[in-house]
Design a protein with these regions (language model features):
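Short catalytic/metal-binding and nucleic-acid-binding patches
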Residues: 1-203
Length: 203
């Protein structure tokens, strides 16, 4: 992995993007979304994993995360990707499960694994997380806004907090919960929240 893509601060805030290989729309199916979310919940409970903001889109995940000592963020992310990839493949390879795209998905994931030094038969996640260390309140706020507005820009919802698979409901405090609890950064008030509370004239 390139040095520029390494997580330097294992316990600080990092913004990361985790795309599915080939940008395949894997997460249009609830079963694959639940694999990701269940694994996150496990990491939160057992591996010191803190998810401060996130959105789960059809073909990628954006998140701001940190890790409590003695755990290391890069190791938790590695294990999370391995586990979710393994569970996804198990589901795809079990022909008793309903999946109309089974052959197509397995073909694509095997194709993208060809010639890779990791010597995998299938590759589901792109290997890099593209971490960006967050060092100021302004940058943190910008990234939270970007994450939460993803579903709005894609046309899936009108308001960020209406996207179930994100932390926006926690920040908006308008709904009981999103899909996975978020460790809210209490000092940060996202710009989009002001926008929807005050209206465009407040900008």
């Amino acid at each position: 992995m390139s040095v520029r893509y390494k997580i330097r601060d294992q316990h600080g805030l990092n913004y990361m993007t985790c795309p599915i290989t080939g940008w395949v729309d894997l997460f249009t199916r609830q079963v694959y979304r639940e694999i990701v979310l269940d694994s996150w919940r496990y990491c939160q409970q057992h591996k010191g994993f803190q998810v401060h903001a996130y959105t789960l889109m059809p073909n990628h995940v954006h998140l701001i995360a940190s890790c409590q000592p003695p755990f290391r963020l890069e190791e938790v992310m590695r294990d999370w990707k391995r586990h979710t990839a393994r569970q996804t493949l198990l589901y795809l390879q079990d022909k008793t499960n309903i999946e109309s795209r089974r052959d197509w998905l397995l073909y694509l994931f095997s194709y993208f694994a060809l010639g890779k030094k990791h010597k995998q038969t299938y590759q589901i996640w792109q290997h890099d997380n593209h971490p960006i260390e967050l060092y100021s309140e302004q940058v943190i706020s910008q990234k939270i806004d970007y994450i939460h507005l993803n579903a709005v820009r894609a046309g899936f919802v009108d308001k960020p907090e209406d996207w179930k698979y994100s932390s926006a409901p926690f920040y908006a405090a308008t709904k009981e919960s999103g899909a996975v609890p978020a460790d809210i950064l209490l000092d940060i008030v996202p710009i989009w929240q002001w926008f929807y509370e005050e209206g465009p004239g407040s900008w």
